[in-house]
């Protein structure tokens, strides 16, 4: 889920130049296929022992829900990505170099994405 803005920007500019389409046109095309989606990331600065407990709990499948968001399935390819009820997701990645737990989320609205992040943070601080 990390972003490489320079590469993405150059790729978009190249495609826009070749196709003659504006950025707005491209966004409309994507939304026509996928619908709108909103992504955000929060970095939680927590003690390493707390971070380790959270990651152990995620590995054990200890979280069935984050607030009102029920976990449907979990992927473990790059952290712990929990798919929620309506194709939203929340993902957890622990920094290996600092006391930080990164939480990523995506849904079909900005307010829902923020609510997912808040619910995840609230749940994790209960560990």
Label every model-predicted segment:
Residues 1-106, 110-127:
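Phosphate-binding and adjacent anionic-ligand microenvironments
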């Amino acid at each position: 889920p990390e972003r490489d803005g320079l590469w993405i920007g150059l790729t978009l500019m190249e495609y826009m130049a070749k196709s003659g389409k504006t950025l707005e046109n491209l966004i409309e095309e994507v939304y026509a296929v996928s619908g709108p989606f909103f992504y955000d990331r929060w970095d939680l600065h927590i003690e390493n022992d707390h971070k380790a407990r959270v990651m152990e709990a995620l590995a054990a499948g200890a979280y069935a829900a984050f607030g009102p968001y029920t976990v449907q399935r979990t992927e473990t390819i790059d952290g712990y990505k929990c798919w929620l009820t309506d194709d939203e997701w929340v993902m957890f990645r622990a920094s290996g170099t600092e006391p930080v737990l990164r939480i990523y989320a995506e849904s079909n609205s900005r307010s829902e994405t923020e609510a997912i992040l808040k619910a995840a943070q609230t749940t994790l601080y209960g560990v």
